[in-house]
Amino acid sequence: MRRRLRAWAAIVLAGCASWFGSARAAVDYWAWHPNVHLARILDDAGRLYLFEGELLVRGGDTLFQRRGFPPPTASPHPVVLVYRLEAMEWPEPLQRQVERDLAAFEAKRNQVWGIQIDFDARTRNLDRYGELLGQVRARLPARYRLSVTGLMDWASQGKLEDLNALQGVVDEIVFQAYQGKGPIKDHRRYFERLSVRGLSVPFKLGLVEHGQYDPDAL
C-alpha cells in the first residue's frame, strides 16, 4: 500500500508515508505542535505520530526539553511517540523519559505502536547512527516498534549497505520530502532514485500538506 505523509502548515507537520506504485493512499499524520486539534484527523487515518520532546545540546551538555502532547484517552488511531535529537546520543535520562511516556500513553488505553527518532544524521555517518539505533532497539521492549526519519540525501547518496543494515533494527524509515512549508527541491529525481535503489528496510515518504508535488512522481 502506498501511504502519503501530510503536514499541517508551518507549525505542524502531519506525517504520512508512501510505497511506490500503489493505487490508493492511506494517510498517517505527524503532529509537531501540541496546539494542533487532533480532532481534524480523518476517521480512516492510520497512525498518529506525536512529537513528545527533544534532546538539546547547550554549552556542551545535553538536556531533554519536553514539548509534546499529553496522552489522549483511548485514541482510535495507533500512536507513535516522536523524539528529536540534536546530538547522536541516547542518554540514560532520555531513556527513562521514554519509558515514562510509553507507560503514560498505555495507561490512557492508547494503542502504542512504538517510538520514532528524528535526527538528521549526515549521510556519511549512517553506519555510526545505525550503531546508536541498535542500542536504542536493544532497550526498547519487544512489543514496541522503532521508526526513524531520514534525509532524502540518504535515499540518493547513502551507501546501500548502511541503509539495509538497518533492517531488523528499525521497522521503517520515513524520508522527509519537504523543506520548510514546501516540497524538497528536485523531489522527482529523489523519488525516482529511491524507487530503484533496492532498500530492504520498509520506508515511507513524508510529504508536506498542500505541497505542489509532481503527481507523476508519486
Task: Show where each model-derived region lies.
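Secreted glycan hydrolases and related glycan-binding modules that recognize and/or cleave
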Residues: R2-L218
